[in-house]
Amino acid sequence: MSTSSHKHNTPQMAAITLLGLLLVASSIDIAGAQSIGVCYGMLGNNLPNHWEVIQLYKSRNIGRLRLYDPNHGALQALKGSNIEVMLGLPNSDVKHIASGMEHARWWVQKNVKDFWPDVKIKYIAVGNEISPVTGTSYLTSFLTPAMVNIYKAIGEAGLGNNIKVSTSVDMTLIGNSYPPSQGSFRNDARWFTDPIVGFLRDTRAPLLVNIYPYFSYSGNPGQISLPYSLFTAPNVVVQDGSRQYRNLFDAMLDSVYAALERSGGASVGIVVSESGWPSAGAFGATYDNAATYLRNLIQHAKEGSPRKPGPIETYIFAMFDENNKNPELEKHFGLFSPNKQPKYNINFGVSGGVWDSSVETNATASLVSEM
């Protein structure tokens, strides 16, 4: 917000002022929210090519990107973009990487070192939502060995000070989440989670966590209110000692922090590797709910949770609606339609453009900052 006392009473400046006010009123404001990234999924048959996608990230000033596998077309397009990348090692490769260092070295050479430093890889996410209580249980015994091998290979490549190795988990691993201070990993999964926590603690890497208040709400609307899920509850919903919770996102996040502490990982940070809200396809999945959740999530990421105040590095799921995903609601998480038209009104950063879901505009966030 400009502190200048100068007044410019020309018609042109009046029009600019009016435009800026309208943009401030209508946009999901991410000005200064450097902790926000967006996940780039590719499960659609009508998506833009990689170069167009990365140009879209750049033109919207989206400075962080999650990539679910080392797609070389996307990595080529990312060269020189200055976008920070969370690079996924897919579940299908975990067992192979765990089986020997030679495989980890090859993977790091082909997918990391060959693109470094032109591509700013920040994290390697080894596996996504591998868990002993889901359909990925067959991979659980291979996950930590795969993480260790990739970590060693990254170190051998001379990138140990630049790239952190972790894994992305979901909330199925949390056995107790209420109240948040009593959060703990499932007793029947501790054999799986404890080695992961120890690895992250020892390597000073964060745990990557996919947090979706939508699924908690839609699965139990009688107990979890929509306002609590959308960051719009007018009053405190959960009083946990001295900590007050007005939204489900914070409660979920802090329950994982508590679980980490109970597992010897008090020093382990958290990156929210996915969060979003579908705009169609199931109960509670509406355009208005999705817009409200995204607006408030983006704002809240600047602030932190009751347990851990401060910016929360958060990746919105996802960049596009992806028509090859199932079930139906999974097709409707995108910030953009496949034709690159925005679904919502969002402003990514002080140097990026404000964009409108009905009409594209060349107005910049610096213009808005003059109001």
From Swiss-Prot:
Q: What is the lineage of its organism?
A: Eukaryota, Viridiplantae, Streptophyta, Embryophyta, Tracheophyta
Q: What biological function has been recorded for the protein in this entry?
A: Implicated in the defense of plants against pathogens.
Its GO CC terms are: vacuole
Q: Which family does it belong to?
A: Belongs to the glycosyl hydrolase 17 family.
**Stimuli inducing this protein:** By ethylene.
Gene3D superfamilies for this protein: Glycosidases
Q: Name one GO biological process term.
A: defense response
Q: Which reaction does it catalyse?
A: Hydrolysis of (1->3)-beta-D-glucosidic linkages in (1->3)-beta-D-glucans
Expression by tissue: Is expressed primarily in epidermal cell of healthy plant, and following induction by ethylene, accumulates in mesophyll cells.
Localization recorded for this chain is: Vacuole
Task: State the protein's name.
Answer: Glucan endo-1,3-beta-glucosidase, basic vacuolar isoform
